[in-house]
Amino acid sequence: DLVXGTNFXKNNPXSTRVAANSXRSPSVYRQXXXXHAKKAAXPPAVVTLL
């Protein structure tokens, strides 16, 4: 998750705030929706689509 966030920040320096939010989102999804995390192969991928 951190690596993806770092790459995103490098690609889009202007959207540093979005990168910070995207880094926090995966942890929330994993804790709140364990069932969805099991169905999704990679929670960060879902966040990336959003």
Swiss-Prot record:
Locate the transmembrane regions by residue number. Answer: none
The residue stretches assigned to a coiled coil in this entry are none
Phosphoprotein as a keyword of this entry, yes or no, is no
Keyword Manganese assigned to the entry: answer is no
Keywords, ordered alphabetically = Protease inhibitor, Serine protease inhibitor
In what ranges is there compositional bias, type Polar residues? 8-25
| Chain intervals for the UniProt region annotation (Disordered) | 1-27
Expression induction or repression: By infection.
Q: Name one GO molecular function term.
A: serine-type endopeptidase inhibitor activity
> InterPro entries, per this entry?
FPI1, Ser_Fungal_Prot_Inhib_sf
**What is this protein for, i.e. what is its function?**
Inhibits trypsin and the toxin protease PR2 of M.anisopliae. Does not inhibit chymotrypsin, subtilisin Carlsberg, proteinase K, porcine pancreatic elastase and the toxin protease PR1 of M.anisopliae.
Question: Which protein are we looking at?
Answer: Inducible serine protease inhibitor 1
Q: Which organism is it from?
A: Galleria mellonella
